[in-house]
Amino acid sequence: MNWKTPSKKIYDSADLKNFEKSIAFEKLQKTLQQIILSVENHKIPPGILNVDIVTRPGRIGSIPLPSLIEPTTTTTTRENKIGPSNGNVEILIELFQYLNKLIDETPPLKGPTRFGNFACRDWHDKIDIIPILKKFKFPQELSSSNNSSSKSNIDGFLLESSYYLLNSFGSKIRLDYGTGHELSFLAFIGSLIEFKILNHPTTTEEINGKEILIIFANYYDLVRRLILVYNLEPAGSHGVWGLDDHFHLIYILGASQFINDKLAPIVQRSLSSQVINSCKLTNFYINAIAFIFRLKTGPFNEHSPIIFDIHNKVFSWTKVRQGLIKMYMVEVFNKFPVLQHFWCGEVLYPWKDHQGNDLPVNEKEETELDKPPETTLNSTTTTTTTTKVSSSTSKIPFTPAPWANTTTTHAVPRNTRNTRNPRS
């Protein structure tokens, strides 16, 4: 396999047509569909999500290290949380514990920080994820009997996959976080699923919905901690006319959790304090709303009108999910400000069409400003440099919520063309 460090392929909105033709896009859609179907009618197990992250500061003293799976946790307790022991899932949990510990060791700088705290850059500089990822039990496809070939494939996999993981924590340069970073984590999980790294080692069964929820719960608690501790800006937010300042996928996962759940709350009542308090630690949709209530005050219909609109016009969680996926296809998969930061490698997310031909790259002049993080595998450190594409963007309106056309289906719908302005 010809592994390669991911590189920039999308330089302006015209490149989105080529992205739609790419194997990379097909793989991302496949991962999205696989994940949202796997979490149907599953709850996040108790003790995984951190209640303090979705609780107003007046009720707590600080933002402590999330209680995920402690090092002293017994095997029995672990199996109660994630089912039969899956060593590679536990390694991911260890990774998030390590990243949370780095936050504890990197307090925010004192003084006013309107546009993000510079200590977040120190946090990014400290990250060294490769030693933890190398603990994975790799499948036969990567760890062949040929030692040199095995090392080459494992290093190659880590080279490409770690790029997406490192890019999922927000921008070190801009000090922001948004749906593009959330997409990078989806891509990272997709790479683990594709090479069966998350399969159960003893039974070879595929990862189940509960384990997917646990992994994403660890991720969302980490990045929301980064947002809170370092005051990260929303990346490319529409303000009140966007679904959420930072997230989108989390709502799709949460809506999917409620599908086929006979005890799921009624959609129209899901903004009530009773539902939020009872479901915020077991369901991503409600958990995300609880996080909004932590960040914002005032009438909900004024600061979050799109979500408010959902709960006045939609009557089933299947239709909620359908509408959210349609919005995702347009607002994430078809927006240049988001996808310009999604880079393509050679194996995991290649910039090739379905016949294996390289797609054209309309390269533009770059300046050293905003290049996503890169990982060096021949050392135990990660190196970060920066570049940014200078391109003009047009003023194109935000996509309206598609609640009026919500035919029930499990398939990921095809998108229509639309773009939005990047954050200034």
From Swiss-Prot:
Molecular function GO terms recorded: peptidyl-prolyl cis-trans isomerase activity; protein tyrosine phosphatase activator activity
Localization annotation: Cytoplasm; Nucleus
Catalyzed reaction equations: [protein]-peptidylproline (omega=180) = [protein]-peptidylproline (omega=0)
Q: What class of enzyme is it?
A: isomerase
Keyword Isomerase assigned: yes
Q: Which UniProt keywords are present, listed alphabetically?
A: Cytoplasm, Isomerase, Nucleus, Rotamase
Extract the signal peptide range. none
Q: Name one GO biological process term.
A: autophagy
The answer to whether the entry has keyword S-adenosyl-L-methionine is no
Q: Where is the composition biased (Low complexity)?
A: 375-394, 413-424
What residue spans carry the Basic and acidic residues bias annotation?
A: 362-373
Write out the ranges of the annotated region (Disordered): 362-424
- Record's Gene Ontology CC terms? chromatin; cytoplasm; nucleus; protein phosphatase type 2A complex
* EC number of this enzyme: 5.2.1.8
Stored InterPro entries: Phstyr_phstse_ac, PTPA_C_lid, PTPA_sf
Q: Which PANTHER family match?
A: SERINE/THREONINE-PROTEIN PHOSPHATASE 2A REGULATORY SUBUNIT B (PTHR10012), SERINE_THREONINE-PROTEIN PHOSPHATASE 2A ACTIVATOR 1 (PTHR10012:SF3)
Report the family membership: Belongs to the PTPA-type PPIase family.
Q: What does this protein do?
A: PPIases accelerate the folding of proteins. It catalyzes the cis-trans isomerization of proline imidic peptide bonds in oligopeptides. Acts as a regulatory subunit for PP2A-like phosphatases modulating their activity or substrate specificity, probably by inducing a conformational change in the catalytic subunit, a direct target of the PPIase. Can reactivate inactive phosphatase PP2A-phosphatase methylesterase complexes (PP2Ai) in presence of ATP and Mg(2+) by dissociating the inactive form from the complex.
Protein name, entry field: Serine/threonine-protein phosphatase 2A activator 1
Species of origin reads: Candida albicans (strain SC5314 / ATCC MYA-2876) (Yeast)
